[in-house]
């Protein structure tokens, strides 16, 4: 059975993808999930520069669940391109990078850097 889908020019072997921010950058869950079997790994947000995220507390229990406000903590695109993308490629994952930034220029820089590393 062919479950492949094409979304905005990205072909995935199936429609199952991870939620950005809940799956880190993939390596954190690779012990539990074969990343190559997913339709795609959607990474946590990554910016042009490292972001420390919000101060603690970042998580609060509420009736029926929890709330979190991590604040887009990330190592920045340079570390992401050097460390995370090669890991995901080696694992056979289709990669969707969630970019974040404080300006249009930041978003463009981060998107271009991610795009360049994915096309190598």
Question: Model-derived features: where do they sit?
Answer:
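N-terminal capping/small domains of soluble enzymes
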Residues: 1-94
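Glycine-rich anion/phosphate-binding loops
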Residues: 74-81, 99-108
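Conserved small/polar residues in nucleotide/adenosyl-binding loops
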Residues: 109-114
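Gly/Pro- and small hydrophobic-enriched strand-loop and loop-to-helix capping segments
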Residues: 120
């Amino acid at each position: 059975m062919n479950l492949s889908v094409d979304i905005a020019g990205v072909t995935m072997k199936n429609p199952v993808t991870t939620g950005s921010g809940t799956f880190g950058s993939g390596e954190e869950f690779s012990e539990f999930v074969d990343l190559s079997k997913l339709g795609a790994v959607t990474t946590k947000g990554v910016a042009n520069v490292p972001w420390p995220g919000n101060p603690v507390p970042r998580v609060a229990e509420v009736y029926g669940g929890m709330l979190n406000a991590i604040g887009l903590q990330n190592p920045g695109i340079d570390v992401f391109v050097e460390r995370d993308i090669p890991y995901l490629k080696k694992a056979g994952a289709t990669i969707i990078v969630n970019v974040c930034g404080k300006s249009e220029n930041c978003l463009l820089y981060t998107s271009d850097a991610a795009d360049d590393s994915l096309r190598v």
